[in-house]
């Protein structure tokens, strides 16, 4: 699978794919934090870093099968000032959409997954409209010691939420092994 990870951080998306048994043939990452990139490179020296999301253009990329990412949440977080898309960091979501649409022009069957915080419904509705899919709300406590409610938007058809321990979890896809 050829993966483009926007807002990659320390490449936990790649780790999750590998833990799910999804073969990653190519992993291209957009990240600006130098320390996060150093951690990712130390673990996966074969990954390709392509700089900030604002400068990513799909015509410069090979065919991509999966676009993943979690755009900055500061404008949406209940812990923040509530600036929503007026926060320049949270506006980077629109770069995710731009890149995803450019990738779709090369591969109409591209799959995507976007993660963000639980936010006001009006802001969530904007993201839902731009991505064309409804979010699924999942609390990390279903899988870890953290209590972190999150919203996930995806067009991966064989993923569905299940109720579990006060949170939700994904069922493993038919092509991925559960670990």
Question: Residues of each region from the PLM?
Answer:
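Short glycine/serine/threonine-biased micro-segments
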Residues: 7, 67-68
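SAM cofactor-binding core of SAM-dependent methyltransferases
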Residues: 3-57, 92
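Active-site glycine-rich loops that stabilize anionic/oxyanionic intermediates
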Residues: 10, 71-72
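Class I S-adenosyl-L-methionine
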Residues: 56-66, 73-179
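N-terminal start-of-chain detector that recognizes signal peptides
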Residues: 1-2, 21-22, 123-128
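Residue-level recognition of the N-termini of beta-strands and the immediately preceding loop/turn
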Residues: 1, 25-27, 108-112
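Redox-cofactor binding/interface segments in oxidoreductases and associated redox assembly factors
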Residues: 51, 68-69
């Amino acid at each position: 699978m050829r993966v483009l990870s926007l807002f990659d951080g320390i490449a936990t998306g790649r780790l999750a794919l590998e833990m799910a048994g999804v073969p990653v043939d190519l992993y291209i990452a957009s990240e600006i934090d130098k320390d996060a990139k150093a951690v990712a490179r130390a673990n996966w020296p074969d990954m390709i870093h392509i700089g900030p999301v604002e400068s990513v253009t799909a015509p410069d990329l090979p065919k991509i099968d999966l676009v993943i990412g979690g755009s900055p949440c500061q404008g949406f977080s209940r812990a923040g000032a509530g600036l929503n898309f007026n926060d320049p960091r949270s506006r980077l979501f629109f770069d995710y959409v731009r890149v995803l649409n450019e990738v779709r022009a090369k591969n109409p069957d591209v799959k995507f997954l976007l993660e963000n915080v639980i936010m006001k419904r009006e802001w969530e509705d904007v993201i839902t409209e731009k991505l064309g899919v409804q979010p699924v709300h999942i609390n990390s406590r279903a899988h870890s010691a953290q209590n972190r409610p999150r919203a996930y938007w995806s067009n991966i058809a064989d993923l569905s939420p299940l109720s579990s321990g006060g949170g939700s979890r994904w069922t493993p896809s038919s092509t991925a092994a559960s670990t």
